[in-house]
Amino acid sequence: MLPEMLRNHKGTIVAVLIALALGVGWASREYAHAEEKAKFVQAQTLNLADIKMKEIVYEGRPRGEVGIYVEGETAGTRNFVVGQARLKPGEEPHPIHTHPEEEVLIVTAGKGEISCDGKKTNIGPGSVMYTGPNAPHGIKNTGNDVLTFYFVKWIGVATRK
């Protein structure tokens, strides 16, 4: 009886099997897409209280502290980093340096000096620095109070290898 029933509903059975195959295929594609998406920085809002600040130590001496808000890849970048740094008076996080990322610094408190591509500029709240890939740059606190700034670094999709 069962084989005859199967023969009578062959079209329905084929349709159900196709639907199951499509469903499994769709589910596996969605799973793969979710795994790929998880590698990228997700939309989010963070408060300073959510960020763990770490001490900046260079040549064995504490220079200030840094906290990273976001780090990872986005749809248009790789090595994307957003953070905040606080430098003690007279300190710099490290000497003038270069890196492959573009970078923006936004000063929110204190006084200092930025060296960008060979030019030194006095800075304070509201000062902004942009530097392209591999351009020499650095920042130093020249004031009597903590120098606070935010930074954003990234490598654009066009420069991906």
Describe the residue ranges of each PLM region.
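Bacterial N-terminal signal peptides
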Residues: 15-23
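Conserved short histidine dyad/triad with adjacent acidic residue
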Residues: 66-71, 83-99
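A short, N-terminal "cap"/entry segment at the start of jelly-roll beta-barrel domains
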Residues: 24-79, 160-161
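Ligand-binding loop in jelly-roll beta-barrel domains
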Residues: 77, 133-158
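N-terminal secretory signal peptides that target proteins for export/translocation
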Residues: 1-8
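Glycine- and acidic-residue-biased ligand/ion/polar-headgroup-sensing regions
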Residues: 100-112, 117
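Short acidic-glycine-tyrosine-enriched beta hairpin
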Residues: 119-133
